[in-house]
């Protein structure tokens, strides 16, 4: 199961109807029939108006390798100057010459250790993935265009500079990363897509249309070489089979258009809806869950459906996050620290189909739930370093008190296998699973 939770404030945008973009870049209206062709890496105008149908409109992509040389821009010079100043101040004051120490050693957990990262304060970690050919080689993403790389299973991390592929004076946040074998994808906001075919040794930027509805928030490498799915926070789903030269839409309209069209169905909160998804989750069958930014209802989509399907909720409790369980059921995290699990596999019909789990969250909000691939152990994380685990399918939970001293909100928990897992938080906090 793959999930992304969109952090930060999103300004809703009204989308009265879907926009279709051809290779010529003309808006035809009606459906998402979009060919997102390769474009110039340093521009956002990715469509070429003089291209003919059937022609390769993409220009040769700029690549950045592990040893690529580049010029240093103003942003990079300022960052280096700040790092030097902070380090010098630490040495002068007689403290350890470690400019960015996030409290290593304060954690006393039997399950997790905190990893020192070469990051500035304030960076929020957003996603992590390892190459399919080597579980020791992976990448970590975050705000402020953060990309870190590990070759020892996540014990140590080094900064990976991909700024040569990005527009200057634009602060990107990398939302999602996915690998299938040595082929990998990274997406971010403002709209940016990076692609590798050699396990991340070299990356290229692939152009995205400025007409893309919403911001890309989730990317999944789905199959053989060149195949991927991309989702935006407005519910647009695209898939490619030719390494992003062309994209085909899987749905015919945004979630706003669907809800405003189906307002007569009685979906609470659907009338004149102009919001976005706050959480999007995908299971191994290619089915999606999308939680509204208000937390009062959610929508689902399965391959072959033309539209997202609204799911009403009658409960007053707002949902913070939700996703799929290993058995195909649904989990919900409600505001205030509650956990609810659907009683059966598949999609529940009513709120009564959920049962509240026993957890003493102390009122701290829970932000994500993950599990080992075997499904034997569930983990949930949240505010003020809160970590809980369950060994009975999520019915009863125990608190890991060893993380109480972690001074961070923990946003994401992901396991690559039963022995390799990570928790991602704000202020550059990364916890690595070490077992009991």
Task: Give residue spans per PLM region.
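Residue-level hotspots at or immediately adjacent to binding/recognition sites across diverse folds
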Residues: 76-84, 95-436
